[in-house]
Amino acid sequence: MLTIFAISDSIAETAHQVTLAVAAQFKEKIKIRRVPYIKTIDDVDCIFPEIAKIERKIIISTIITVDVREYLTKKCYEKNIYIMNVLGPLIDSISSMLNTNPEYKPGAMRQIDEIYYKRIEAMEFAMQYDDSKDYGGLKNADVVLIGLSRTSKTPLSMYLANKGVKAINIPLMPEIGVPDEIYTIDKKKIFGLKIDAFQLIEIRKKRLDKFHRISSSIEYAGDERILEELEYSDRIMKRLGCKTIDITQRAIEDTALIILESIGYNKNTNIY
């Protein structure tokens, strides 16, 4: 039986997945052994006696660090063991095309996976706590958005979620008030979305026209009603002492950028 050693200087997930994909092309039974965290030349020396015991073997390596990768390759050549460096040649080719040196970061793929799953978690969070569905997420939120109806709270929450930021949004309505819990969280997390009265009237009227709502919803887009709501939202935001952002004629991306900078968000990957 053939044994394939999936060796890496991280958790060996990439090497393991590549090996599984290749092994699936054959009917014969193939044993796969994952060998993670081979970070030094000494680590290579430690695993070699065990590898040498196996009669039929191949090594699949995703080791990033050059000296460790080259040492492993040299040992394999000396022992007449077939080795495939999965990432090395590709890194070298891309480095040549870009005319720049790679960072050689072990576990970089795992970091990208973590960023991806953080985004998914943030999106689920945003949907769960959208528009006052549940205030239980306040203490776990990275950002709390407050504002009147039609101030882009939901799309802004989803945009932030795509950056891995957990955002909860709370609508401001004079008849309902805000949850008491909001006064217990760090005000630096809270962002009040303000808007010009004339633009809000226009947005709400278009909303009503879209759904052909007239009689029971006239107040929703009425001048007096909107001015009352704006005064109420101003009072709440002042009481909370939170940062306010005027979203009038402002793109969601611009509003999000202000928030991300305020909470110290760092873009930590160059993968898009």
UniProtKB/Swiss-Prot annotation:
ADP binds at G147, L148, S149, R150, T151, S152, K153, T154. Signal peptide: none annotated. It comes from Clostridium botulinum (strain Alaska E43 / Type E3). NCBIfam families: PRK05339.1. Belongs to the pyruvate, phosphate/water dikinase regulatory protein family. PDRP subfamily. It holds the Pfam family Kinase-PPPase. Keywords: Kinase, Nucleotide-binding, Serine/threonine-protein kinase, Transferase. Bifunctional serine/threonine kinase and phosphorylase involved in the regulation of the pyruvate, phosphate dikinase (PPDK) by catalyzing its phosphorylation/dephosphorylation. It catalyses: N(tele)-phospho-L-histidyl/L-threonyl-[pyruvate, phosphate dikinase] + ADP = N(tele)-phospho-L-histidyl/O-phospho-L-threonyl-[pyruvate, phosphate dikinase] + AMP + H(+); N(tele)-phospho-L-histidyl/O-phospho-L-threonyl-[pyruvate, phosphate dikinase] + phosphate + H(+) = N(tele)-phospho-L-histidyl/L-threonyl-[pyruvate, phosphate dikinase] + diphosphate. Its EC number is 2.7.11.32, 2.7.4.27. InterPro entries: Kinase-pyrophosphorylase, PPDK_reg. This is Putative pyruvate, phosphate dikinase regulatory protein.
